Every structure is written in structure tokens, then in C-alpha cells.
Amino acid sequence: MTDPKETINIENVVASTGIGQELDLQSVAMDLEGADYDPEQFPGLVYRTQDPKSAALIFRSGKIVCTGAKSTDDVHESLRIVFDKLRELSIKVEDDPEIVVQNIVTSADLGRQLNLNAIAIGLGLENIEYEPEQFPGLVYRLDDPEVVALLFGSGKLVITGGKEPKDAEHAVDKITSRLEELGLLD
């Protein structure tokens, strides 16, 4: 049986940063090749990097959110590219702006089918939401690490809310040991 932790895959890393000054997004959009800016649709300018692949959402306030990266290293590299592009437009950007990871979304596989009804009862209603008529997954809120896990009948998991990659490993450990205690992983 494969260790479920070995199946963990980072699907998305979201991080935020800022350059400490307001921006004229209309003028940035005209000068920054490949930028998308349609304030009627979305208040920020979208700038996509290809390698690594991600999207930076740049707001008038100077705040920047990077999403779509597959690792924390990729987030930092993508934002470095964005900072360099802004500097090329003569926009002052500190040498090393603080980058804060806000959310890491991972997937994993427990490698067996899950009886979500039994799990919902076993885990207790205070930590879970399970309404199969509304959504096929069971929502399990963990306190430590502070993440939300979606469990599916297929045995697949989605873990969201992590701040670092090891949060997913801790969550998978906690979920598997809790389900084993309840005799629900046989």
C-alpha cells in the first residue's frame, strides 16, 4: 500500500506582496506587454508568467497577489519576474519585498474507497460538513494544522488553507490515523 503522503501534489500556491505605492493600472497595462486590464470585469491588472506558470493580480494600491504556482519556489520566482518588469517601467520596487504565502492547495490519495456517511458520523458533526445532495465531498476542518480537507468517496483528498507544504503532510497523517482509529480505513 502506497503511503498517502507520497501522493501529495501541490495544485496551487497563493501568495501576497506589495510594492508600497499606488499604481496607475491603465498606464502600467499599456506599457507592460501581455498585461490584461479590464476594470469593468476585475479591479486588478492580470500579468501572467510562463516559466514558472502563474498569474499576478496587481492592484491600484500596489498590492500583488500571485496565484497558480505549483510550489513556493515558483511563487517567489514569478514575483521576482513581476518586480523586474515593474522596475523596467521605472516603478520603484524594493530589493526584496516581503512575500507571504496565504494558501497552499494540495491533493492526495488514500488509495481506497471511503464510506463518507460512516466517516461523517465517526468524526463528529462539530468538525465536518457533509451534505451529499449539495456537494459530493465531506468537508473536514482540522485545528492543527489549521486546514480544511475535502474527502471524496474515491479516497481522493483536497487540502486547502495550508501555509507551508508540510501542513498537507501533517493533515494527511492526522486524517489517516483518525480514520484508522475509527476502523474506517480497512
Swiss-Prot record:
Lineage top rank: taxon: Archaea
Keywords, ordered alphabetically: DNA-binding, Repeat, Transcription, Transcription regulation
Keyword Transcription regulation: yes
Pfam families named among the record's database cross-references: TBP (PF00352)
Mapped Sequence repeat ranges: 10-86, 101-179
GO BP, sorted A to Z: DNA-templated transcription initiation
Functional note: General factor that plays a role in the activation of archaeal genes transcribed by RNA polymerase. Binds specifically to the TATA box promoter element which lies close to the position of transcription initiation.
Similarity comment: family membership: Belongs to the TBP family.
HAMAP family, alphabetized: TATA_bind_prot_arch
Name used for this protein in its record: TATA-box-binding protein E
